[in-house]
Amino acid sequence: MPIDLVRASVEEAAILTNLFQYYVYDLSDVVDTALGADGRFVLPSFEAYWSDPWRHPYLVRVDGTVAGFVLVHQRSRLTGDDKTWDIAEFFVMRKYRRHGVGTAVATRVFNSFRGKWEIRELKANAAAIAFWRSVIATYTKGDFTETLLDDERWRGPVQSFQN
């Protein structure tokens, strides 16, 4: 099963927008979200991903089929440090979960951007917490720290490591 991680072009912005609907739906179990009058989730604008040099949008494909996305920031959401890498959003379609796709994609992202990393999960998202703890522990061979935040910056665990 070939897994590709490719930087999304501006022409592929609609694919990202469409996938984000599924992502927000998945998160609706743990985040209070509501549908707009048109029956879709209200989404942020993704235009900045093609104009801000510190934002990096990626599409995930499995066997050539769109299977998810990763939005990477070169800026800490917690401190604003522009030397820290941050996975802003990470999504793999359910069909491809528990088949190594997420782990392979996360590893490729980490290997593509060297330096300090922060990975955040929402406190109520037990599946994401378990996934990221496992991926990061394997990737770093256990050399990472985890902090549990519960303030205006974030509510949930944050793993930090250097690669």
Where are these regions (language model features)?
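A conserved beta-turn-beta hairpin within the catalytic core of GNAT-like acetyltransferases
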Residues: R75-I87, R97, G115
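Conserved beta-strand-loop-alpha-helix junction that forms the acyl-donor binding cleft
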Residues: E118-R133, A137, T147-W154
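Conserved acetyl-CoA-binding loop-helix of GNAT-fold acetyltransferases
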Residues: V92, R98-N111
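Conserved beta-strand in the GNAT
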Residues: L59, T65-Q74, D86, F91
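A short beta-loop-alpha structural element at the N-terminal edge
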Residues: I3-N18, L27
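A short, internal acetyl-CoA/4′-phosphopantetheine-binding micro-motif in the GNAT/acyltransferase core
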Residues: I87-R98, E121-K123
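Conserved GNAT-fold acetyl-CoA-binding loop/helix
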Residues: V24-E47
